[in-house]
DNA sequence: ACGATTTGACCCGC
DNA sequence: GCGGGTCAAATCGT
């Protein structure tokens, strides 16, 4: 039995992530007792930064699996190699989840979307769960081969709580837009829509190291990094007015490791990045709470 | 007419 | 065999 890629490398990542998360937690603590607006802002940045970095690493590791192992399916085929299909096995995809709460007062008809357009492709009753789980994938899966997917499930007890788990990395052009539209409009020339994630991941990691020291007073530290962070759903959610970021995000890799974090976050970001750049407030997968429409979102398929 | 959603069937890993 | 995830035909909405 061997793991996907050098476990030493993974160990390193794991440690790094761990540190980052602890760091984030500390900031979150401070955030709670921070009095001045400035301090809070600063701390918020820090917190996001920690998460961002962690995710970047997670994503990076996910890609690593795919590339170096040409599929990353740990077992079942040891001598069987699919021709150059980087058909990322789901297992090796980066994955994280977060809880989102629908603000009671806010109109439920507002859109909560994480900036991407999703298409629902399935719904399933989950054992022990009161509500069904919705399965979504990126609208551009077919056209652009974007593999990102997510699952949305309403919490048993608290109907105002949604648990969303994301998988895979957005490689669609939308990824470039989301990441930049929302935080701040300072695109860099390198943000072409053509970049594949494999490159982006690495670049991102590198960039991050530079930019971590460079962000000035951008609204969000993440703004400067390309594509990748679009997967940072947690922050995308924070920006929404109707949904409060609930303060719990967990990342997990395939290697049986998972890290959970809870913190008292009060997302207060404002801007407006929705899937449709201009008009139609496309319903979000999360909030259709009609008896008829458990979730909005997308549904779709693939040959 | 076309794209999105619904929903039962199918597939696959445990 | 069971449960979770995906497919794809039918249906719905625009």
From Swiss-Prot:
It is found in: Nucleus. Residues 266-278 have a biased composition (Low complexity). Belongs to the WRKY group III family. This is Probable WRKY transcription factor 30. GO terms for biological process: leaf senescence; response to hydrogen peroxide; response to ozone; response to salicylic acid. Keywords: DNA-binding, Nucleus, Transcription, Transcription regulation. One of its GO terms (cellular component) is nucleus. It comes from Arabidopsis thaliana (Mouse-ear cress). GO terms for molecular function: DNA-binding transcription factor activity; sequence-specific DNA binding. Residues 65-92, 266-291 are annotated as: Disordered.
